Each structure stands twice: as C-alpha cells, then as structure tokens.
C-alpha cells in the first residue's frame, strides 16, 4: 500500500516522497507499518515525527499508532477489523469485507484501502494510482488488484461522498 501510493504520488504527481517501513512477523493482520513523507519541496528528514494521516487496517495498528496522529490529523480505518477507534473523528470502510466478498481474496484488502484513499486524498488521482499498480505488480496479479482498487474507490465514493473537500492541511 505505502510503496504503491508513494510511487504514484512521486512519479505521476511530481511530489517528493520518502518511505520507511517495518514489516515484522505480524505483517498479516498485525501492526506492520509504512511511513510516507510527501511534500512539494525536497524532504529534509525521511521519517515523520507526527502523522497527518493514519491508515489502520487492524485494531492492533490503530491502537499502537494512533498517538502519533496530529490533533488535526485524519484517521482511516478498515471497519471490518477496527471495531474500537480512539476517536469519533474517522473515515472508514469495511476493506477486508470488500476484499473477501467482491474480490474473493482477503489479501487484496490493502489495495481496496488504496482505492478508498485515492478518493479521500485530494492529491491522489485514480489514473495515477492505477499506473502505479501496473508499474509495481506482476502481470499475473494485476487484474485482480485493479479490480480491488476500483471496488475500494467506488465504495468510498458512495460512502464518503465529500471525499477530498473534507481535507485540510495544518
């Protein structure tokens, strides 16, 4: 998710992007992490001290990383797995449920989330993210992931109609 989003923002939109990641043995369903720093200017330090946006695809990740979110930051959760949010201010979609029911593969959850994020982030465009998927994924799994992306994007457009207009930078 982080790599594809970062690639799309850097290559397709011209932003400066750095990514750091931590994928331990808990990577499936646990608190793995990918940090992106995105800026229109060169980046001085590659790791964020506080987060403008947090994507929590598991309860453990939400619990562990929420405290790093700025007071004005935005929280996006997979409502299939995150049932207790530390704030009432969040966006959410049942990403795991969408992946299971519409794609037939729970491993597509992160790409469903990417589709949803593309709707809510004003600086991400669907065509750019699709090209990023094409550039980063093997051909044998591309079609399935494009379907997952579209499912997440369309569901977010339906359930979060205001999308990017809700975003403000601090």
Predicted regions and their residues:
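Active-site cofactor/cluster-binding pocket
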Residues: 1-170
